[in-house]
């Protein structure tokens, strides 16, 4: 019997694009678990989430960057800096755009920076094709093809999975020979506490009004397992203003209870254990513009 001497391939892929183009949805579909939060609110992703796709032949580490946007505070500065710095660390780049929106100034801003990258493949990924008629898709594709010389163009639906296997296969073919950076069963390099905080924040974004989401952070105060396998989690939801605290708590605590109930289901799925989740809400005025507070919440500038 011949030995299988096929070389193992591994590498890093950055997913960049304007806010709310479906980067997190794509990542979660490929990995098969929820490692990046999903919301219809722009600027949902704040830290570079690494999702890990592994087969017996290759391993791709995806970096889901914060959406590149015009910044209005120090948190916004951090998010944009994080997105741009990721381009220096990877073997390939995916630029994701929406099929149901024309090319705009935000897309052009990113494209001008991608043009400077000549030593790595840059793929144009047109997401949400399930929302448009094929006849409407062609002009969108042409407008981006005219913008720069892409390695390849992939129309996809991250929500429905259309054309994603073909995209991942192509990415795999461009990964260099290398080691297996992470074990087969590891799907993210973030600690469980971080992912738990993100799952809670996702529910806040999904359930609260428009003025609240950009002003929310979640801090895990304690996370301990008892002898019976129950994981006790105490977490604080940080908001920017007293009015937002009232919205998150809701009348008679109804909103906070719903946030906790939905988050607990996802956390139990993540941990594979029963979870007791206790939530508080705290006001920290102007936290998004204070470097010290940002660092205490886990947004560390020197790590990016």
Curated annotation (Swiss-Prot):
Lineage: Bacteria, Bacillati, Bacillota, Bacilli, Lactobacillales
Protein encoded by which gene: era
PANTHER family: GTPASE ERA, GTPASE ERA, MITOCHONDRIAL
Species, as recorded: Pediococcus pentosaceus (strain ATCC 25745 / CCUG 21536 / LMG 10740 / 183-1w)
Region (G3): 64-67
Region of interest: G4: 127-130
Gene Ontology molecular-function annotations: GTP binding; GTPase activity; ribosomal small subunit binding; small ribosomal subunit rRNA binding
Region entry G2, spans: 43-47
Primary location group: cytoplasm
UniProt name for this protein: GTPase Era
Its membrane topology: Peripheral membrane protein
């Amino acid at each position: 019997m011949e030995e299988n001497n096929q070389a193992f391939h591994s590498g890093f892929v950055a997913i960049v694009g304007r806010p709310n183009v479906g980067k997190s949805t794509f990542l979660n579909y490929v990995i098969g678990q929820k490692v990046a939060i999903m919301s219809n609110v722009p600027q949902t992703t704040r830290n570079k989430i690494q999702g890990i796709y592994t087969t017996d032949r290759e391993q791709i580490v995806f970096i889901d960057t914060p959406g590149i946007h015009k910044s209005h505070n120090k948190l916004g500065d951090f998010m944009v800096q994080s997105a741009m710095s990721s381009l220096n660390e990877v073997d390939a780049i995916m630029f994701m755009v929406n099929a149901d929106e024309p090319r705009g100034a935000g897309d052009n801003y990113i494209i001008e920076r991608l043009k400077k990258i000549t030593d790595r493949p840059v793929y144009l990924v047109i997401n949400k094709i399930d929302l448009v008629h094929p006849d409407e898709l062609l002009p969108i594709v042409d407008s981006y093809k005219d913008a720069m010389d892409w390695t390849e163009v992939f129309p996809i639906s991250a929500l429905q999975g259309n054309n994603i296997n073909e995209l991942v296969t192509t990415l795999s073919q461009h990964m260099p020979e290398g080691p297996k950076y992470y074990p087969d069963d590891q799907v993210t390099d973030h600690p469980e506490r971080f992912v738990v905080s993100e799952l809670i924040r996702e529910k806040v974004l999904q359930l609260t009004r428009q003025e609240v989401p950009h002003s929310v952070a979640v801090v895990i105060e304690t996370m301990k397992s008892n002898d019976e396998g129950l994981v006790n989690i105490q977490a604080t939801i940080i908001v920017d203003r007293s009015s937002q605290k009232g919205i998150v708590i809701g009348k008679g605590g109804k909103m906070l209870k719903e946030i906790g109930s939905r988050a607990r289901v996802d956390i139990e799925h993540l941990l594979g254990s029963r979870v007791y989740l206790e939530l508080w809400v705290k006001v920290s005025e102007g936290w998004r513009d204070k470097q010290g507070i940002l660092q205490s919440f886990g947004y560390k500038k020197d790590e990016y």
